Amino acid sequence: MKTFNYYEYKSKRFDTSAEAEQVRNFIFAFKDGKQWATNYAADMVVNSFVDTYGDKASDFVLVCAPAANNKKYCKRFNRFAQMVSKGARVQNGNEHISIYGERTAKHFSTDRVCESFDYRVALDREYFSGKKVIIFDDVVTSGATAREFANELAECGAQVMGAMFLARTKRMYN
């Protein structure tokens, strides 16, 4: 699966520069659904779609990767997806995904093991069947979440074209 990211996300432990802090603040503001961050992210993604696909953007479906629960998903992605859909004329797949229950947020889990409390993601199989899908998420570290979600979409008959991320975690070791 092809992937694209706008920024590198560097942990404060490894990079205390003003630039790295600015990226971290942007990512956390986006995760919290802050309007300024949502607007900025949507503008970047709209420009990418328009520059890459032009009038053919309407052939694609943008769907955001599932969050820890439905409340976080809606807060983080609903307005963003609506803005991108309107600005780039891409189809909004978020309206065809439902999240039930809850799992531990992955960015809070040091060992990346998530506890699940009746967590389930339901996809509208009929809607996604035959669609060209691009997945969006805020941060990618290993890519496992995007790959798992891509597999679920493919099981519905979607053709996953790639994934876009605001940032990719940059691992920095001694």
Region spans (language model):
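Active-site-facing substrate-recognition patch
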Residues: 1-61, 98-129, 142, 168-171
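PRPP-dependent phosphoribosyltransferase catalytic core
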Residues: 19, 147-174
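A structural signal for isolated positions on well-ordered beta-strands in alpha/beta enzyme cores
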Residues: 61, 134, 161-164
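Glycine-rich phosphate-binding loops at beta-strand->alpha-helix junctions
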Residues: 66-76
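Charged helix-capping and loop-helix junction motifs
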Residues: 76-82
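Hydrophobic alpha-helical packing residues
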Residues: 84-88, 153
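A phosphate-binding catalytic loop at a beta-strand-loop-alpha-helix junction
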Residues: 135-149
